[in-house]
């Protein structure tokens, strides 16, 4: 009986800690929004809807709302050339931001994108960005 109670309490505690971590990841939304406005909105627009045929939308983007943020982090670090989004081909180039922005700044931008325009993506930490930056 006590084992079940202890196990239940451990699960509840883990859930609470996870919720606090997620809430803290989105806590710098104003900073993320300011960075997004400065570095991203000219192409992806303030609305996150991009420009059809020129710059892909971030609103509702599979890259933004996936549980695994690796592709999103790599796109910001390394930039992108062309590709398809939502069945639309894009020939434009997204610049790399690895030399321009720090890990916390990239995490703030990604977290802003993950929590804006109706997106419900998983929060990203500066440590995750640093780990991706360190990978070849």
Regions found by a protein language model. Give the residues of each.
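Flexible coil segments in periplasmic/lumen-exposed cytochrome c-class electron-transfer proteins
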Residues: 84-136
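N-terminal secretory signal peptides that target proteins for export/translocation
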Residues: 1-6
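C-terminal region of N-terminal signal peptides and the immediate post-cleavage residues
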Residues: 23-27
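N-terminal signal peptide c-region/cleavage motif recognized by signal peptidases
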Residues: 17-22
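Sec-dependent N-terminal signal peptides
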Residues: 7-16
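Periplasmic/extracellular electron-transfer cofactor-ligation site
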Residues: 28-70, 78-88, 115-123
